[in-house]
C-alpha cells in the first residue's frame, strides 16, 4: 500500500471512530461549552504572570487565549479564576490585564495558542499605564507595562500568532522570540505573526510547487488586524533584551492589516516583513529603529502582493540596510511623509529600493544614508514610479538612481549604478528603471540673479513635469535634492522655464522630471546661481546634526544654556579591540575596552564611529571578509547594548586586506585580528592603540 493511500485509510478510520463516539455519547462536553463561550464573547482578565493551564489561584495569558478561542471552558477554572471571566460588551472578545505590580513579565516556554477568533488583547488596561506620557519626542509612544517574552534559554518562535479577522494587539512589550536558525523547515519566527489558520500551509496538498501562492481557497488570510501602541523588540525601560527577536511583525498572509504607533527595534531581521499577501497594509506613525542586526537588514521589507500598501509618517532610523526595500512585489505601494535617516549601518544600501511599477515615494526626508536615496531597479521591469517632493541630504550616492541596461549585480540591487547617460536608443526604455526617462538639462551652468530671483531654463522629456530643487551640499555634481523651490512643465519641444524666488548668490539648483507614463528621472547636473558681477560667496555649510534616532520628550522647563567651549576638547579613547583565532565574540577583556569606548560615546553624542573588521591572512579572502564583518557586527551589538544609538555606528569589513604588519608570528596575527574604530567628529580626538586584549593563539595553533 502506498504511503498516500495508507494516510487516507487511517484518516477514514479516525473519522469513523469519531462518528461512533458521537453517536454513543463518548465525546467530552468541553468542546460544546467552549463553543458556547465563543458565541457569548468573553472578557478575560489576566492576573497571573505564570505560563500554565490549570485550576489554581491565577488566570494566565495562555488560559485567557484558550478561553476566548473556545478550547477551554469556564467550568474548568478554579473558583478563584472564574471571577476573572465575564461577558464582553464590545463587538469582540477582550483580554485585559491586572497583574501584580512586581509581576508584569509573562515568560512563555512554548508557543501560545493562535488567536483564532476576533479579540482585543489590551495591555493598556494594566494599572499604571500612562497613555498621555510619551517616551520619546518624535512620536506619541507611551511605555507599556506588560511584557511578553520567551523563557530564558528556550527557543519560542512567535510571541502572538494571528489567524482570525478583527484581532487587535495593543499596549504590550513583546521581545525575545526567535528560533533555532539551523532548522529551515519552520514557519517564520516573529514577535507577531499574521497568517491564515494552521501556518504554514500543508505543502503535501500539491506534489510540485506552483508558480502561484501554494494556498487553497480555504487558506483565507485574516482581515482587519490592528497592531498598535506596542513596543516590539524593546523593553519598557528602552533597553535591549538579552535575547533579540528574529522579526517584529511578519505579515505572512493577510489583508487590511494596520501597524501604527509602535516602537519596533533591535531585531535580528526586519521590523516589518511581508510574504505572500499584505494588500491594503498600513504602516503608520511607528518608530522603526535599529533593526536587521543579524539577518534581513532592511527596516521594512515588502514582498508578495502589497497592492495599496501605505508606509506613512514613520521614523525609520538606524537600521542595518534600506529603510524600505520592495522585493519583486505585486501591486503598488505609497511611501509618504516618513523620516528615513541614518540607515545602511551594516549594508551600504539605498534608503528606499523599488522593484515593480506605480509606486509613489513622496514627501519623505531621506538623510544620512550610507548609500543613495531612492533606487529603481531595471530588472524586474520597474516603471511609472513617482518620486517627488522629497528632501535629501548627506547621502553616499544619488538622490534618485535609475538602474540601467539590465544591471543585476549585487551592487546594483543595493546601491544602484550612479548617473545614467542620456537615452540613446529605444532599448533603454526596456532595460532601465522608470523606462529611462531623461534627467533635465539646464541651458547654462550658471544663472544670474535679479535680486533674489533667477530665471531657470532647460530641457526635459516633452510633456514632463519638472521640479526644481535647492542644493545645500557640495558633495555631488547631481544633487542632493535638498528642498523643492518650484515646478513647471516642459512643452512639446521639451523646453521649460521657471522664475525661482528666494535664492542667494552661491546657491546651486538641480531638477527632476516626472512623466506619468514612465515615472521620475534622476537629478540634473547642478547649476550655480550668482550675481552679475560674478562675486560668488561660498555657500554656508549646513551644521551637522547630533546623530540620534530618538530623543527624550521635550522638557516643560527650558534647559540651562550650555556655555560653548572656547578651546578644543581632547578625547582619549581606544581605537581597536582584538579577537581570538577564528572567533567573532567579545572576550571579557575586550568588553572592558568597549565599556570605556561606550562611556566616551555616551558623553559625546556628536561622535559617529565606523567599525572596520579585520583578520589575519590565513584562510580565503571570502572567508576573512565574512569573519571581519561578523567581528564588526559583534562590536556594534555590544555598543548598542550599552545604550549607544545605532544611528552612530556603521560597519565595514576589510578581511585580511589591511594588516597591521607583514610578519607571520603569532603576535603579528593576534594584532591583525581586530576591529578598528574610526571616529568622526569636529573636535580633536586622540586615539589610543591598545593591546591589553590581545589574544595570541597557543603555539602550533591552526584555524
Model-derived regions, located:
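Extracellular beta-strand solenoid repeats
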Residues: 96, 122, 147-149, 161, ...
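Short glycine/acidic-rich loop motifs that flank beta-strands on beta-rich extracellular proteins
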Residues: 156-158, 178-185, 236-247, 268-274, ...
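N-terminal, post-signal-peptide segments of secreted/periplasmic proteins
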Residues: 26-223, 244, 367-369, 378, ...
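Periplasmic peptidoglycan-binding/anchoring modules of Gram-negative envelope and division proteins
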Residues: 572, 579-613, 640, 677, ...
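Periplasmic OmpA-like peptidoglycan-binding domain that tethers envelope proteins to the cell wall
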Residues: 615-687
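Short acidic/polar inter-strand loop motif in beta-rich domains
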Residues: 515-521
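All-beta strand scaffolds that present successive hydrophobic residues in beta-strands
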Residues: 121, 168-170, 226-228, 257-260, ...
Amino acid at each position: 500500500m502506498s504511503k498516500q493511500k495508507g494516510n487516507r485509510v487511517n484518516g477514514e478510520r479516525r473519522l469513523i471512530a469519531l462518528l461512533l463516539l458521537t453517536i454513543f455519547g463518548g465525546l467530552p462536553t468541553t468542546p460544546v461549552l467552549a463553543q458556547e463561550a465563543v458565541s457569548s464573547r468573553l472578557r478575560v482578565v489576566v492576573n497571573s504572570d505564570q505560563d500554565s493551564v490549570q485550576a489554581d489561584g491565577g488566570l494566565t495569558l495562555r488560559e485567557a487565549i484558550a478561553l476566548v478561542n473556545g478550547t477551554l471552558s469556564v467550568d474548568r477554572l478554579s473558583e478563584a479564576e472564574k471571577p476573572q471571566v465575564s461577558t464582553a460588551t464590545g463587538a469582540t472578545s477582550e483580554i485585559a490585564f491586572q497583574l501584580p505590580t512586581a509581576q508584569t513579565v509573562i515568560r512563555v516556554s512554548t508557543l501560545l495558542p493562535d488567536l483564532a477568533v476576533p479579540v482585543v488583547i489590551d495591555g493598556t488596561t494594566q494599572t499604571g499605564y500612562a497613555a498621555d506620557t510619551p517616551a520619546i519626542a518624535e512620536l506619541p509612544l507611551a511605555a507599556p507595562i506588560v511584557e511578553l517574552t520567551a523563557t530564558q534559554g528556550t527557543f519560542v518562535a512567535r510571541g502572538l500568532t494571528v489567524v482570525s479577522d478583527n484581532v487587535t494587539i495593543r499596549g504590550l512589550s513583546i521581545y525575545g522570540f526567535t528560533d533555532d536558525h539551523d532548522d529551515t523547515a519552520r514557519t517564520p519566527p516573529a514577535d507577531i505573526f499574521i497568517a491564515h489558520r494552521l501556518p504554514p500551509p500543508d505543502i503535501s496538498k500539491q506534489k510540485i510547487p506552483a508558480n502561484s501562492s501554494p494556498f487553497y481557497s480555504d487558506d483565507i488570510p485574516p482581515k482587519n488586524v490592528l497592531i498598535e501602541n506596542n513596543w516590539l523588540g524593546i523593553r519598557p525601560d528602552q533597553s535591549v533584551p538579552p535575547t533579540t527577536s528574529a522579526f517584529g511583525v511578519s505579515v505572512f498572509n493577510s489583508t487590511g492589516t494596520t501597524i501604527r504607533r509602535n516602537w519596533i527595534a533591535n531585531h535580528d531581521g526586519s521590523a516589518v516583513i511581508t510574504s505572500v499577501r499584505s494588500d491594503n497594509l498600513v504602516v503608520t506613525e511607528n518608530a522603526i529603529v535599529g533593526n536587521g542586526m543579524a539577518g534581513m537588514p532592511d527596516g521594512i521589507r515588502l514582498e508578495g502582493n502589497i497592492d495599496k500598501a501605505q508606509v506613512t509618517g514613520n521614523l525609520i532610523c538606524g537600521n542595518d540596510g534600506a529603510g524600505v526595500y520592495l522585493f519583486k512585489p505585486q501591486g503598488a505601494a505609497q511611501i509618504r511623509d516618513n523620516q528615513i535617516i541614518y540607515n545602511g549601518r551594516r549594508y551600504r544600501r539605498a534608503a528606499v529600493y523599488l522593484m515593480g511599477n506605480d509606486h509613489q515615494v513622496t514627501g519623505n526626508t531621506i538623510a544620512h544614508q550610507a548609500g543613495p536615496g531612492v533606487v529603481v531597479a531595471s530588472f524586474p521591469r520597474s516603471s511609472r514610479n513617482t518620486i517627488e517632493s522629497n528632501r535629501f541630504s548627506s547621502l553616499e550616492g544619488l538622490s534618485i538612481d535609475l538602474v540601467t541596461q539590465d544591471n543585476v549585480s549585487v551592487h546594483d540591487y543595493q546601491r544602484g549604478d550612479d548617473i545614467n547617460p542620456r537615452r540613446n536608443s529605444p532599448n533603454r526604455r526596456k532595460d532601465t528603471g522608470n523606462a529611462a526617462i531623461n534627467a533635465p538639462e539646464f541651458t547654462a551652468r550658471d544663472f544670474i540673479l535679479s535680486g533674489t530671483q533667477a530665471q531657470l531654463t532647460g530641457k526635459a522629456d516633452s510633456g514632463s513635469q519638472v521640479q526644481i530643487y535647492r542644493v545645500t551640499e557640495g558633495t555631488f555634481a547631481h544633487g542632493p535634492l535638498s528642498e523643492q523651490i518650484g515646478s513647471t512643465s516642459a512643452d512639446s519641444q521639451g523646453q521649460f522655464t521657471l522664475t525661482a524666488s528666494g535664492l542667494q548668490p552661491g546657491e546651486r539648483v538641480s531638477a527632476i522630471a516626472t512623466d506619468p507614463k514612465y515615472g521620475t528621472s534622476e537629478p540634473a547636473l547642478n547649476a550655480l546661481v550668482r550675481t552679475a558681477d560674478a562675486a560668488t560667496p561660498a555657500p554656508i555649510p549646513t551644521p551637522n546634526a547630533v546623530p540620534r534616532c530618538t530623543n527624550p520628550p521635550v522638557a516643560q522647563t527650558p534647559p540651562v544654556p550650555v556655555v560653548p567651549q572656547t578651546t578644543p576638547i581632547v578625547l582619549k579613547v581606544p581605537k581597536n579591540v582584538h579577537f581570538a583565532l577564528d572567533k567573532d565574540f567579545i572576550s571579557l577583556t575586550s568588553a572592558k575596552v568597549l565599556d570605556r569606548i561606550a562611556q566616551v560615546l555616551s558623553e559625546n553624542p556628536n561622535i559617529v564611529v565606523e567599525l572596520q573588521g579585520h583578520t589575519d591572512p590565513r584562510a580565503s579572502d571570502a572567508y576573512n571578509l565574512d569573519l571581519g564583518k561578523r567581528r564588526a557586527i559583534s562590536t556594534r551589538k555590544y555598543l548598542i547594548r550599552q545604550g549607544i544609538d545605532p544611528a552612530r555606528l556603521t560597519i565595514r569589513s576589510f578581511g585580511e586586506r589591511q594588516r597591521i604588519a607583514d610578519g607571520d608570528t603569532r603576535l603579528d596575527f593576534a594584532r591583525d585580528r581586530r576591529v578598528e574604530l574610526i571616529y568622526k567628529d569636529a573636535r580633536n580626538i586622540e586615539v589610543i592603540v591598545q593591546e591589553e586584549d590581545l589574544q595570541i593563539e597557543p603555539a602550533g595553533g591552526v584555524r
